[in-house]
Amino acid sequence: MDQKGSQRALLAQTINEIVKLLIEAHNQKKDVNLNRLKCIVAQKNGLSFQPKLVDIIAGVPSDYKDSLLPKLKAKPVRTASGIAVVAVMSKPHRCPHINFTGNICVYCPGGPDSDFEYSTQSYTGYEPTSMRAIRARYNPYLQTRGRLNQLMQLGHSVDKVEFIVMGGTFMSLPEDYRDFFIRNLHDALSGHTSASVEEAVAYSERSKMKCIGITIETRPDYCLPRHLNDMLLYGCTRLEIGVQSTYEDVARDTNRGHTVKSVCETFHMAKDTGYKVVIHMMPDLPNVGLERDKEQFLELFESPAFRPDGLKLYPTLVIRGTGLYELWKTGRYQSYPPSVLVDLIATILSLVPPWTRVYRVQRDIPMPLVSSGVEHGNLREHAMAKMKELGLKCRDVRTREVGIQEIHNKVRPEDVELIRRDYTANGGWETFISYEDPKQDILIGLLRLRKISDKAHRPELKGNVSVVRELHVYGSVVSVADRDPKKFQHQGYGSLLMEEAERIAREEHGSDKIAVISGVGTREYYRKLGYELDGPYMSKMLDSAAA
């Protein structure tokens, strides 16, 4: 047997032994360090490399798959929130505000005119999502199928999928390309080949793999009523809006191409349409300074003109080929020292209210491409350690959600209570209802309810209407058709949250109707609760419900 053949035989033997030891440990109710086990068995058998997790998962007998897969799952955080997130990229295209300002933002890498010419705007082409998109030649169907297969091989459930459409300003692309892109995302889940977005959505609604939502990255100038209407037809439920700074002078100096006033107007319109609003913010921009950075985040969370539902923190990076790189090279811009940046991020995280989710704390750009800026690949961990040292707590949604708590702290909720928080934001009355264990500060499920303002442009939301902008029960993914007593999805928390939302809408808001901005794949769930399709929303009349 040649060397290659003998290595293959050793690999098969090693995988069999590892699986056998895993089954023994499971039967004896023992925990196993998989990395250590792989190392020991591979070394014992004279294998020159460790077997891949995908191969070990493939070697697990079918009668042990259900019990062993959760223990073998790679990066369990990927589906800890109850959803498999699939990030896809649109084709490279120029940023639309070049036509008005003559150039892109000073810090922005990537795009067709950059040193990274195969990348989309604001990406380098070396981020994991970018590389998957380039391999698939930016084909949305291939990107989706490839990522789903990858997640399944790593032991994750892909029963509930949320898409994030990245790669510049998607809504600035031609309508026929946008329709093609969205159609293929839905078709990749349903297996059907559709001729229109409407047909794709109809098949996706009944698909085994449910599209529970689509998130689209955009800019305030591409969040006008016509854009909001188009995104509703796509099945979009969440917007990621690039804000970067709450200061008008910084927006002007960095060449953003829009004002902060337009950001506030966008938030108002988006929330009155039912969308969840996540914003991108960049600490350490030129001409800001540490104190102004702290003040803008205080304003972001406390001013009713902002108050986003989610936040992506992207500390400024200096990357070759950008205007900022030239400023840095000539000494006109200097990044915060690493310790100062960690302190700033820790301060920002301590300010986050309990109804806001911090999705990211840094960009996915590989460190070798960064000339100056973030020096830690795990900035969130450093910031959390600093908070612990200072006696501060991060109370954002992600830190408290039950799936993350189980993975990181091995704690489960005991005394669960219904908790309500009210606040005003963007011209409307917001109510954040949640099921939590207040003693351990663990979040199990949440609902965002809004009393629509009189500025709503959608006909379905005019008059006395309340809208549910988000309903989410956390914990690792459970199939829509299954119930698992150890997991929190499908335990009735969702319907209890909806009952409370209906009561508040009827008795306190004085609303005649309650609407839900629902992902395409979750419409059937709302039908069971007495809701009907009302344009792109699921709605219920409250007067008849009360009777």
Swiss-Prot record:
The pathway is: tRNA modification; 5-methoxycarbonylmethyl-2-thiouridine-tRNA biosynthesis
Write down how the cofactor binds this protein. Answer: Binds 1 [4Fe-4S] cluster. The cluster is coordinated with 3 cysteines and an exchangeable S-adenosyl-L-methionine.
- Coiled coil as a keyword of this entry, yes or no, is no
- Pfam families for the chain: Acetyltransf_1, ELP3_N, Radical_SAM, Radical_SAM_C
> What cofactor is this protein dependent on?
[4Fe-4S] cluster
Gene Ontology cellular component terms for the protein in this record: cytoplasm; elongator holoenzyme complex; nucleus
Source taxon at top rank: Eukaryota
Q: Which reaction does it catalyse?
A: uridine(34) in tRNA + acetyl-CoA + S-adenosyl-L-methionine + H2O = 5-(carboxymethyl)uridine(34) in tRNA + 5'-deoxyadenosine + L-methionine + CoA + 2 H(+)
Which residues participate in acetyl-CoA binding? K160, E470, L471, H472, V473, Y493, G494, S495, Y526
Tell me which NCBIfam families the record gives: ELP3
Q: Which PANTHER family does the annotation name? A: ELONGATOR COMPLEX PROTEIN 3, HISTONE ACETYLTRANSFERASE-RELATED
Subunit composition? Component of the elongator complex.
Query: Family, per the entry?
Result: Belongs to the ELP3 family.
In its UniProt entry, what is this protein called?
Answer: Elongator complex protein 3
Organism, by scientific name, is Caenorhabditis elegans
Q: What is the lineage of its organism?
A: Eukaryota, Metazoa, Ecdysozoa, Nematoda, Chromadorea
Gene field: elpc-3
